[in-house]
Design a protein with these regions (language model features):
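Glycan-recognition and catalytic cores of secretory/periplasmic carbohydrate-active enzymes
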Residues: 1-276
Length: 276
């Protein structure tokens, strides 16, 4: 993805100073009581501090990010050591261990932290990744959304274990969508779950193109998406614009489906334009 600058001159300086004020406010508050995940937890906040410290060349902010990271790892490991029922483990991307693992991998890959942090959750990786399979095997698919965050965590790893679990996930999901009763249950999933699964499958296809049936699943979920009742909210409109880019970049997607996606977006744009 190529980033384009959207703020210039005074507005750019104002935006920069505002972000710095946010970082300073975070440093001045005790956030240990919060969840530890990526979207709504301390690993996401830690990433923000690392990025701000690098951008502003502020070692103090970076050290605060490192301290927050060390604290949340210590707390998470303590919870894992005392946990008796791993079915109670929060494996979500937003607040749980999948988001923590993804965040640590991001910091490692971008050289914010040393290799001593690698393999932090090695002992629990199999438990986390297995959950990605079990949620697909559950009769009612009530927790299918959990597979998205775990899958993103698995993709962020460069291990044979994670690739094997992603392969099993694709195989299980492919087998289930072929069943009439199961496909109806998947179609009844939330809009965000369908969007999340499409994006996850696309990322799997890019990183591991040798995993069979991934493209078939992407196309199947695109069909589900095209039949989904759409709202004209700004949030959904933004998601639709993102998906249109995916449609246009994938020549193997059916032409009729592609045209329908464009039609939906054009009509939603007309309806929603005052909200933008």
């Amino acid at each position: 993805m190529k980033w384009k600058r959207i703020l210039f001159n005074e507005r750019a300086e104002l935006g920069s100073n505002t972000l710095l004020d946010i970082a300073i406010a975070i440093v001045d508050h005790d956030l240990s009581f919060r969840k530890q995940g990526l979207m709504f937890g301390n690993i996401g906040t830690s990433l923000f501090l690392f990025q701000m410290g690098k951008w502003k060349v502020d070692n103090h902010i970076q050290m605060e990010g490192l301290e927050m990271l060390t604290s949340l790892i210590r707390r998470t490991n303590t919870e894992l050591e005392t946990m008796r029922n791993f079915n109670m483990l929060d494996v979500s991307f937003d607040t749980g261990i999948s988001g923590i693992g993804w965040g640590i991998n991001y910091l490692l890959q971008n050289k914010f932290i040393d290799s001593e942090f690698s393999g932090i959750f090695t002992l629990t990786d199999a438990i986390i990744l297995r959950r990605m399979i079990t949620v697909v095997q559950e009769p009612e698919l009530d927790k299918l959304y959990q597979a998205i965050g775990i899958g993103l965590y698995a993709i962020s790893q460069d291990s044979r274990l994670s690739k094997e679990y992603l392969r099993r996930f694709i195989k299980e999901l492919f087998n289930r969508v072929k069943e009439n009763d199961t496909s109806k249950k998947i179609v009844r999933q939330s809009f965000n779950t369908i969007i999340g699964l499409i994006r996850l499958l696309e990322k799997i296809n890019v990183k591991f193109p040798d995993i069979n049936h991934t493209k078939e699943l992407i196309l199947w979920f695109y069909r589900v998406f095209a039949r989904f009742p759409m709202s004209s909210s700004t949030f959904n409109l933004q998601i639709l614009y993102t998906l249109l880019n995916c449609y246009e970049s994938m020549s193997w997607v059916e032409g009729e489906l592609n045209q329908r996606a464009k039609y939906i977006i054009q009509n939603l744009y007309i309806i929603s334009r005052p909200c933008l």
